Amino acid sequence: MQNYDVVVVGGGHAGCEAAAAAARVGAKTLLVTHKVESIGEMSCNPAIGGIAKGVVVREVDALDGLMGKVIDKSSIHSIILNRSKGPAVWGPRAQADREVYKPTMRDMVLHYENLTVISEEVVDFTVDGVEERPQISSVLLSNGELIKTTRLVFATGTFLGGTIHVGNESFPAGRIGDKPSTKLPQALTAHGFQLGRLKTGTPPRIDRDSINWSKLLEQKGDVLPTPFSFMSECVSLPQISCYVTHTNEKTHEIIRRNLHLAGSRCESLLDVMAPRYCPSIEEKIRRFPDHKSHQIFLEPEGLETNSVYPNGISTSCPIEVQLEMLRSINGLEQAVMLRHGYTVEYNFIDPRELYHTLETKKIKGLFCAGQINGTTGYEEAAGQGIVAGANAALSLVQNQEPLVLKRSDSYIGVMIDDLVTLGTSEPYRLFTSRAEYRLTLRSDNADMRLTEIGRAYSLVSQERFDRLSQKKQEMHALLNALKGIVATPNDIAEYDIAIAQNGEKKNAFELLSHPNINMEVLLKIWPSLRSFSAGTLALMEIEGKYAPYLKRQEADIKSFLEEENLSIPKDILYSDVYGLSKEAQEKLQAVKPFSIGAARRIPGITPAAIANILIHLRCKHKSSHKSL
């Protein structure tokens, strides 16, 4: 019998990051996937990043993950979304050449130290112990082989009990052309997990040569693409344009006429939730009947392929209806469909079954990441994968603290806290609005926030850590230089600096907080600052712009962390807490919050309930982090 420290099931975005993270920490890791050639497949949109999502990719990269490096090698259309707004909501996004992204990710994974990859299917797992929380002991493969392990990560994507729907046709599949995992859901149910169903969809693909590009609006990317990885100097491939078109009344009439035939509208799927913010075109027509048109982005899927992805018209209508719909759209009158769209439904667990480490509460050593936890999106999956994989490996080390990212230090922390505290009834995706501390959680400073944390957990290479140290030294030197330049009221008048004067002296860093002052203005007045790199100057400008607000946010974060550090013992009996209502007891017992802060975020838990818990813990002297 083979023996591995960590076994990861699934070779998608969550699984790749989980396996690589476990291997980086030092665990002997096995990645089991149905087909090795499908590792890193972009099942839907061939793009990485976006609003909030782009920050997650940079956070994954700051922890030495794979996604940022891979997209930099495969990007063909890069853009910073929300560029006209503040840096706190900038969203780096890159269209990928899918035939470059997938093999690049696959090659990285196949050549990763401490990591073995096999093409197989995990059909069951065993546990040791009959106590309340048994321990993972092995996994069973479809060929009958038993592999011994005490740490298991499920990153099953849409394959867990996956079923595809196109029109009136339904068939088992995790992705078009790939069989689902049908036995694992049974195994999870047998061990007491309650599984729900979610669905998502994808649009048809169009032949590039059948599109009348002259009728469409061109959308160019950034002239100087910004790499995702802090280790990349530039992107590798030539950049191309995307194009914009719209649906129209004729399109909508075709869809309305055939709405009853859409697979996503079949009776068995009506109560299965789809992504709220990425609805199918038939759902858009149903929900927004007054809209005359809906925007479609035509995104080439690569430099050497004819396949074009029409972003915005995910559909599960019958194939002939899909073609009719496409040909009603401006520029697509002669469209040739290379592949039809479809809806896929799949199993997920209630993420409230997880700790913040992404380990399940029911079974010790079992971790989950990605769509199995109710999320949608490559980036959300990658963020969970790196946390689950790292913690699976870290938990093997005696007395080792787990990697728990907080709401105050990362979007990954926001996402995990939302999931394990609130749960979800629909596919969860990240937005900047979900983060209370988004002025701090920016795409430009992900390495400053997380790389040192990653290094402390053996996730980050010496090379990356050294690069961060050099960057911090440069930032510190520039900050000192700016603070050392003092502008008197006379200087402000002499240099024609357009700010309100109150008679006080201001240093150059303080000047940056004024809306009319940017780094370019300071460089004209004090040319000596040009000795610093353009990248360092740009980052410092952002810090200067937000400085007054960041100071206030630091106070908010301090208050937040005080409650996060007030731990609640895992063995607490909420029925023993005096004055706690039955409803509060049930909610707290279901979530099992790790801290007072986490308990406060549970819907329905009142300030009075929190006070009762604090009194109970003080009396019992059971706080593990600090005196309560």
UniProtKB/Swiss-Prot annotation:
This protein's UniProt keywords: Cytoplasm, FAD, Flavoprotein, NAD, tRNA processing
Family according to the record: Belongs to the MnmG family.
Residues annotated for NAD(+) binding in this entry: 274-288
Annotated Gene Ontology cellular component terms: cytosol
GO MF assignments: flavin adenine dinucleotide binding
Record Pfam families: GIDA (PF01134), GIDA_C_1st (PF21680), SAM_GIDA_C (PF13932)
UniProt GO BP: tRNA methylation; tRNA wobble uridine modification
InterPro entries: FAD/NAD-bd_sf, GIDA_C_N, MnmG, MnmG-rel, MnmG-rel_CS, MnmG_C, MnmG_C_subdom, MnmG_C_subdom_sf
Keyword tRNA processing: yes
Subunit structure and binding partners: Homodimer. Heterotetramer of two MnmE and two MnmG subunits.
UniProt: FAD binding residues: G10, G11, G12, H13, A14, G15, V122, S181, Q371
Protein name, UniProt field: tRNA uridine 5-carboxymethylaminomethyl modification enzyme MnmG
Listed PANTHER family: GLUCOSE INHIBITED DIVISION PROTEIN A (PTHR11806), PROTEIN MTO1 HOMOLOG, MITOCHONDRIAL (PTHR11806:SF0)
Cofactor(s) for this UniProt protein: FAD
Subcellular location: Cytoplasm
Function: NAD-binding protein involved in the addition of a carboxymethylaminomethyl (cmnm) group at the wobble position (U34) of certain tRNAs, forming tRNA-cmnm(5)s(2)U34.
Record carries keyword Cytoplasm: yes
